[in-house]
């Protein structure tokens, strides 16, 4: 009788052990509940967010979130192998299938607000704050001569943002023609060096080049700031003097340029 009981106990133990392993394996296959908190995104600047959640093996979830829902947590079910959370506002037509943002050569940067983060999701529930911030700098150029006959070309070496939010290397060009008041503007992406420049082009040749990136760096402007500010540039009639003013700053910087 004792041998029968011992045998029965062994069978029951094996069944429990097999069941436990099975439950554990099933839980691993279950998705992670990802809670996204938009409460630190300013609805006045960001009326909506186009959410791209990417994980391995081709998982790409796209969700449109209106600002009225920013006060509530958004719950998504994602694979348990980590997820990249990208959110955009103002980037329609520029976001690729892999979640990166590409600026076509000849176009300016879209007036985009963005969030990028990577979340570990090897768990039953994960939490992430989504902070959508301004990721473009609007450079407005004032030319002293209102009847300015030339085109102003802004060139750089950043052409968008990678899937991880880092500035993407590539040629950038946007051509501007000042209006009747001598004003024009361009939106540029976040920079990583001083390569940004401003060319004065008469249609056949570059007459003058301004080291725009160096002027901006000398001003103390922070390209790594969470939200990028805007810049105003002034060019005198002879194109030999540059003024630079950063949005929200009282001081104005002056640079003399050799002809």
Which residues does each predicted region cover?
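Extracytoplasmic cysteine-anchoring/structural motifs
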Residues: 20-259
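Sec-dependent bacterial lipoprotein signal peptides
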Residues: 1-24
């Amino acid at each position: 009788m004792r041998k029968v009981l011992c045998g029965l106990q062994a069978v029951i133990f094996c069944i429990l052990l097999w069941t436990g392993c099975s439950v554990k394996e099933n839980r691993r296959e279950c998705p992670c509940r990802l809670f996204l908190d938009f409460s630190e995104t300013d609805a006045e600047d960001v009326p909506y967010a186009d959410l791209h959640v990417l994980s391995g093996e081709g998982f790409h979830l796209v969700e449109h979130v209106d600002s009225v829902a920013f006060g509530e947590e958004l719950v998504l079910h994602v694979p348990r192998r980590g997820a990249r959370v990208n959110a955009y506002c103002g980037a329609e037509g520029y976001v690729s299938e892999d979640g990166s943002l590409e600026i076509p050569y000849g176009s300016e940067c879209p007036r985009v607000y963005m969030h990028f983060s990577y979340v570990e999701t090897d768990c039953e529930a994960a939490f992430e704050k989504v902070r959508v911030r301004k990721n473009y700098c609007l450079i407005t150029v004032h030319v002293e001569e209102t009847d300015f006959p030339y085109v102003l070309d802004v060139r750089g070496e950043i052409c968008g943002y990678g899937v991880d939010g880092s500035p993407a290397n590539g040629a950038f060009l946007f051509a501007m023609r000042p209006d009747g008041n001598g004003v024009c503007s361009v939106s540029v992406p976040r920079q990583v060096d001083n390569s940004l420049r401003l060319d004065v082009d008469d249609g056949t040749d570059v007459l003058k080049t301004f080291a725009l990136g160096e002027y901006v760096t000398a001003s103390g402007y922070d390209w790594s700031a969470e939200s990028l500010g805007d810049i105003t540039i002034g060019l005198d009639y002879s194109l030999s003097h540059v003024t630079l003013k950063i949005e929200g700053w009282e001081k104005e910087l002056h640079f003399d340029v050799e002809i």
